[in-house]
Amino acid sequence: RVVPNFVIQGGNSDHPNTSKKRREIGRYLLPPDVKKGVKHERGIVSMPSSEIDNPHRLASPYEFFIVQQKGGAYHLDGNYTPFGKVIKVMEVVDAICAQAVDEREAPINNIRMKIEIVKN
């Protein structure tokens, strides 16, 4: 999902290995964890949740979004679980946000992301 001047969302791959791993893990949702006080500033990586039939805002463990909006997206605070931050190459996130999308906010062309997790 690509929403210019707001977020990019990914993680839900249609690759066969991803489908296999999801079957092994099973279907489950995670409760929001908003007590840490992390704000949805530009570059924050957070967990999305559906607003449809989801009053407790449970999140998919298989997806994530990155705040691209300059100035942050603080209206998301308290509703979604931030768990990381882009520390290099925000220009890549900006370039993804510049891609053409269809009416469902899906990129016209496949965008593959390689993500490296750095622990403190």
Task: Show where each model-derived region lies.
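Cyclophilin-like peptidyl-prolyl cis-trans isomerases
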Residues: 1-120
